[in-house]
From Swiss-Prot:
A motif (YXXV motif) lies at residues 710-713. This is Envelope glycoprotein gp160. The lineage of its organism: Viruses, Riboviria, Pararnavirae, Artverviricota, Revtraviricetes. One of its GO terms (biological process) is symbiont-mediated-mediated suppression of host tetherin activity. Glycans are attached at residues 39, 72, 81, 116, 121, 142, 150, 167, 193, 205, 237, 240, 271, 277, 288, 299, 309, 364, 397, 407, 447, 464, 469, 614, 623, 639. GO terms for cellular component: host cell endosome membrane; host cell plasma membrane; membrane; viral envelope; virion membrane. It comes from Human immunodeficiency virus type 2 subtype B (isolate UC1).
Length: 857
């Protein structure tokens, strides 16, 4: 038995030693260049191949290198909650507003005008062709239709214009002058009578209207967005992506988006870059808003024309204020647009795509899905298809077109529509603001490819039937959610923390030799799907590539800002380029400042002396990515950062003290008075300490000598001078001693003055203690006497409260006992009743049998 116990003891001892030696403490290690990121909202900048247009004069030159690298990660994407799409909407609006350049206030034109509703230029009725006499073939145009060239297709009339006269002070403020102006009928509000009509410019009472003072017109621009240095763009490359996907597994990374074109229109999107040989849609995750990309196979196009030979002249009203007017000799014909392509099949495919969408809950019958326009009470930009053609705003009535694509019997079906032109329009980005555009001279024509459809999917119940309306929408911003909704802007966070067993200033660990990896700037995130262990071995090459890419992009931005410094005020891109430059510099300096504050400047792998704060949280170097690890330790970042800064401060303090000691190696420092003062002060402290030590030793020696003699403790001071010393018995001295000799050294010698001084100290200390005791006792007595009246009600209240609590406890206990007894009695009674009922039910067959037996007997 003892032998077994010894074996167990030895085994436990070995296990303890092995555990002590095998357990190694982990320390915080800083890694620079890891493939990790977080969502960002910094400004993007533009790149374009066309540097001739005014809107892109400040964009970076696009070299056509649109590189995308696949990343083995899973990321969430949302086209509506997306900083890329929001920036696109804001920037395009800024370009749109800059192109108009509103600067001349037209508030002085809010005067009463006398307008004609008679005459050759205003009374001509629109040229229309009755539906009954129009052949069906004439309602559908093609490239060979003769009416296209002359703008005489059935249903296209003359534009409703009005000549108005008004009086206003001109260059001479004391004299009024009569002016003549021609207006579109839709831009006036009139009250007519038999003789004349009094009209006002529309929206005079709601807004300050401004007219363009520069001849810029809104032309489409092609450009792409690029991320600032230190940032990247992730894109969901999944064909099933429909505007919202919390886990997209097919992700690519790039530094720029695809090329896109500025679009400002309702109902349809024109000249988009997302068209494919399929129809797909983006659906809002919490709403019925959608944007549908049309199949390019059907070759859908729209051709718009504004006939006429207009001239534009400035009218000087008041001093230095010019207003662009449009005198007309004859009424112009209406603007109109016609649609080419297989629209009927395209809309049928749109309906089938809606049915297949997982969020759709309506009918599966395409005959019950209709393409409709918005309600009649909406704004003109919503009720009509609103677009811009060479500076003129077209408001097109789409009833004929909807009747055609839906094949509505009994209605007018045409593949072209008539459009009205308005110069006072509602803005599409800021509610309630109006702008005024001067018309462009001559005949205008615009040709566009129709690439998308903006709509709301409305499911409703008509009796027992479920129907669906594809209601056309005026959300211009949806066009850019289709163009850029699959992108996501992220900030690369190259600094990461992980626990390792290596402490700072330890010997260098052996590293595996690997081939040099040539990575571009995007190659940093290409390693995002790799394990942490494999990624950490290539941090040197990655960090060098990262820094090189940041420096290169910064240099490009700096060059373009320097070259076009005088044009920064023209467009939004000048400001965004400067913001991007500042953002890049701030990010780089911030990372380097953090590394420097931890003592890890210009290091890819930096070991520290800070212990890892959570020993239970360690990474799986072979199976875990850096992005996954960063999400797990995100809550430790603040704590680790503070610990690293404290450790670095302590190290710098130690280095400072060491350098102060090393400074004595220089001969000249010996003559520095400030250095000597510290040592002089230290010497004074040493002398004072020696004096105090000497006093303590003296007191201890005096007390030791007092213990050798006898004296009554409470005797009076003179008594110890009369004390009879007790001598030790000793024999006759060997030699005769004279009076001058000191006698035997072992004889007792009394020191009366030391004893008297000690007695005096004891008496004073005793008096001091008695005084302190009496003072404290008196203070406590007075305090208790003062607090007694105030504490008495409190004590009484506490007694009442204690009594109430005890009574409440007893009441609860009594109620509990009563409830328990009641429940027990009720349960027993219920159980007896149930048992009797069950016995009665069980006895029924026996009673029946007994009854039958009695009946048979």
């Amino acid at each position: 038995m003892a032998h077994t116990s010894n074996h167990l003891f030895i085994l436990l001892l070995l296990i303890s030693v092995y555990g002590f030696l095998g357990h190694k403490k982990n320390y915080v290690t800083v890694f620079y260049g890891i493939p990790a990121w977080r969502n960002a909202t910094v400004p993007l900048f533009c790149a374009t191949t066309n540097r001739d247009t005014w809107g892109t004069v400040q964009c970076l030159p696009d070299n056509g290198d649109y590189t995308e690298i696949s990343v083995n990660i899973t990321e969430a994407f949302d086209a509506w909650n997306n900083t890329v799409t929001e920036q696109a909407v804001d920037d395009v609006w800024s370009l749109f507003e800059t192109s108009i350049k509103p600067c001349v206030k037209l508030t002085p034109l809010c005067v009463a005008m006398r307008c004609n509703n008679t005459g050759t230029n205003t009374t001509t009725k629109p040229i229309t062709t009755p539906i009954t006499t129009t052949k069906p073939s004439e309602n559908l145009l093609n490239d060979t239709s003769p009416c296209i060239k002359n703008d005489t297709c059935p249903g296209i009339g003359l534009e409703n214009t009005v000549d108005c006269y008004f009086n206003m002070t001109g260059l001479r403020r004391d004299e009024k002058k009569q002016y003549k102006d021609t207006w579109y009928e839709k831009d006036l509000e009139c009250n007519g009578n038999s003789t004349s009509t009094i009209c006002y410019m529309r929206t005079c009472n709601t807004s300050v209207i401004q007219e363009s003072c520069d001849k810029h017109y809104w032309d489409s621009l092609r450009f792409r967005y690029c991320a600032p240095p230190g940032y990247a763009l992730l894109r969901c490359n999944d064909t099933n992506y429909s505007g919202f996907m919390p886990k997209c597994s097919k992700v690519v990374v790039s530094s720029c988006t695809r090329m896109m074109e500025t679009q400002t229109s309702t109902w349809f999107g024109f000249n988009g870059t997302r068209t494919e040989n399929r129809t797909y849609m983006y659906w809002h995750s919490k709403d019925n808003r959608t944007i549908i990309s049309l199949n390019k196979y059907y070759n859908l196009t729209m051709h718009c024309r504004r006939p006429g030979n207009k001239t534009v002249i400035p009218i000087t009203i008041m001093s230095g204020l010019n207003f662009h007017s449009q005198p007309l000799n004859t009424r112009p014909r209406q603007a109109w647009c016609w649609f080419k392509g297989n629209w009927i099949e395209a809309i049928r495919e749109v309906k089938e795509t809606i049915i297949k969408h997982p969020r759709y809950k309506g009918t599966n019958n395409t005959e019950r899905i209709r393409l409709v326009g918005p309600s009649a009470g909406s704004d003109p930009e919503v009720r009509h298809m609103w677009t811009n053609c060479r500076g003129e705003f077209f408001y097109c009535n789409m009833t004929w077109f909807l009747n055609w694509v839906e094949n509505r019997t009994g209605t007018t079906q045409k593949n072209y529509v008539t459009c009205h032109i308005k110069q006072i329009v509602n803005t599409w980005h800021k509610v309630g603001k109006y702008v005024y555009l001067p018309p462009r001279e001559g005949t205008l024509s615009c040709n566009s490819s129709v690439t998308s459809l903006i709509a709301n999917i409305d499911v409703y119940y008509d009796g027992n039937d479920t129907k669906t309306n594809i209601t056309m929408s005026a959300e211009v911003g949806e066009l850019y959610r289709l163009e850029l909704g699959d992108y996501k802007l992220v900030e690369i966070t190259p600094i990461g923390f992980a626990p390792t067993e290596i402490k700072r200033y330890s010997s260098t660990t052996p590293r595996n030799k690997r081939g040099v990896m040539v990575l571009g700037f995007l190659g940093l995130l290409a390693m995002a799907g790799s394990a942490m262990g494999a990624t950490s071995l290539t941090l040197s090459a990655q960090s060098r590539t990262l820094l090189a890419g940041i420096v290169q992009q910064q240099q490009q931005l700096l060059d373009v800002v320097k070259r076009q410094q005088e044009l920064l005020r023209l467009t939004v891109w000048g400001t965004k380029n400067l913001q991007t430059r500042v953002t890049a510099i701030e990010k780089y300096l911030k990372d380097q400042a953090l590394l420097n504050s931890w003592g890890c400047a210009f290091r890819q792998v930096c070991h520290t002396t800070v212990p890892w704060p959570n020993e239970t949280l360690t990474p799986d170097w072979e199976n875990m990515t850096w992005q996954q690890w960063e999400k797990r330790v995100n809550f430790l970042d603040a704590n680790i950062t503070a610990l690293l800064e404290e450790a670095q401060i302590q190290q710098e303090r130690n280095m400072y003290e060491l350098q102060k000691l090393n400074s004595w190696d220089v001969f000249g420092n010996w003559f520095d008075f400030t250095s000597w003062m510290a040592y002089i002060r230290l010497g004074l402290y040493v002398v004072a300490g020696l004096i105090v030590l000497r006093i303590v030793i003296y007191i201890m020696q005096m007390l030791a000598r007092l213990r050798k003699g006898y004296r009554p403790v409470f005797s009076s001071p003179p008594s110890y001078t009369q004390q009879i010393p007790i001598r030790k018995h000793r024999g006759q001295p060997a030699n005769e001693e004279t009076e001058d000799e000191g006698g035997n050294e072992g004889a007792y010698r009394s020191w009366p003055w030391q004893i008297e001084y000690a007695h005096f100290l004891i008496r004073q200390l005793r008096n001091l203690l008695i005084w302190l005791y009496n003072g404290c006792r008196n203070l406590l007595l007075k305090t208790s006497q003062i607090l007694q009246p105030a504490l008495q009600p409190l004590r009484l209240s506490l007694a009442y409260l204690q009594y109430g609590i005890s009574w409440f406890q007893e009441a609860i206990q009594a109620a509990t006992r009563a409830a328990r007894e009641t429940l027990a009695n009720t349960g027993r009674a219920l159980w007896k009743a149930l048992r009797r009922t069950a016995e009665a039910i069980i006895a029924i067959p026996r009673r029946i049998r007994q009854g039958l037996e009695l009946a048979l007997l």
